[in-house]
Design a protein with these regions (language model features):
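Extracellular glycan-interaction patches encoded by glycine-rich segments
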Residues: 200-225, 237-244, 302
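Extracytoplasmic low-complexity segments
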Residues: 54-75, 245-302
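Extracellular glycan-interaction surfaces
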Residues: 63-75, 103-109, 130-194, 286-301
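Extracellular/lumenal carbohydrate-interaction signature centered on repeated Trp-anchored short motifs
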Residues: 84-100, 153-162, 217-223, 248-250
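Extracellular, beta-strand-rich glycan-interacting domains
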Residues: 98-108, 218-242, 254-264
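Short boundary segments that mark the start of a structured unit
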Residues: 1-68
Length: 302
């Protein structure tokens, strides 16, 4: 920090120079973490003057931009499978609270598309985050399973990064859907628990899908940067504050996939960063592909 002693000349209300703050190294900054630095006026040399307390401290927000890769699932038949039958500290067959999160970019929600559904993640006829709509009315986010389904208030964009989430809160007996951290719908759901090991029409050995649901053409047709499964009911504030990254060891985080690279020992596997062992296996045709230059947060003009 430079210029920490400033002079306000007689008859003026601001100094001719300002305090200069420079970040000389990012080595100790955690990826995806936002930092807030308070800068305060310690005192003034003229004892006849006082500092307005409400203006004594300003807060500088240091928001890092992550530039990474994302899995390219834009072609038909490209998706991931996850086997949640493996034992961990979480009872994945009977979770009383659940949150799914994904940061995705749909690529084929176009006027020529004949599809009604683009899948995000989950379990068909159980707890499945997907879209529902048409090329005339657009596609909304939908949480299906545990009838009735919830549709989002707003239509989803094509070819833009969006953060999508659904929540089951067993204590309230409700389910919720969010787009970019904004609540888009809620309904009662008194099922009691969510089973991550079962889905209708999906692989019994790996029932949880990312980028597909059921057994027909409901593929995502887009990019996926991150996806997470929690054993807690995340709030809107939680969702907004951790779009780009979260500590893999956070309590309640069942599985966390960053789709920026394959596992070292298997080019078709994306590792679960929590250490719980719920790796995502590419089930599509051909090789797993990636797109580069993915920014988060993405504030560029589209």
């Amino acid at each position: 920090m430079e210029n920490t002693s400033l002079i306000i000349e007689n008859g003026k209300s601001i100094s001719s120079e300002g305090v200069r703050l420079s970040i000389i190294s990012r080595e100790l900054l955690k990826e995806g973490t936002t930092y807030v630095l308070p800068v305060s006026i310690v005192g003034v040399s003229d004892k006849n003057l006082s500092v307005i307390e409400g203006s004594r401290t300003i807060y500088i927000v240091i928001n890092q931009v992550i530039i990474t890769q994302a899995a390219d699932l834009s072609n038909r038949g490209e998706y991931f499978k996850v086997d949640f039958r493996k034992e961990s500290k979480y009872n994945t067959a009977a979770l009383t609270n659940v949150t799914f999160e994904a940061r995705v970019r749909f690529k084929k929600m176009t006027p020529t598309s004949g599809k009604w559904c683009f899948s995000v993640m989950g379990l068909e006829e159980n707890f499945c985050l997907r879209t529902a709509g048409s090329n005339t009315e657009g596609w909304k986010l939908q949480l299906s399973g545990g009838s009735p389904a919830i549709d989002s208030r707003d239509v989803l964009p094509n070819d833009k990064w969006v953060h999508l989430a659904c929540v089951y809160d067993g204590s309230q007996g409700k389910k919720f859907i969010y787009v970019n951290g904004e609540l888009q719908g809620e309904l009662p759901d008194t099922r009691g628990t969510v089973d991550l090991t079962y889905a209708y029409g999906q692989d019994a050995n790996a029932a949880f899908y990312i980028g597909q649901s059921a057994a027909d053409d409901r593929y995502m047709n887009g990019y996926v940067s991150e996806a997470r499964v929690w054993a807690v009911a995340r709030s809107a504030a939680d969702l907004k504050n951790n779009v780009c990254w979260v500590d893999p060891l956070t309590d309640g985080l069942v599985a966390y996939w960053r789709f920026n690279e394959p596992a070292e020992d298997n080019a078709k596997v994306v590792t679960d960063l929590t250490g719980n062992g719920y790796n995502a296996t590419f089930a599509g045709w051909g090789n797993l592909r990636f797109v580069e230059g993915v920014r988060c947060p993405d504030n560029t003009a589209e």
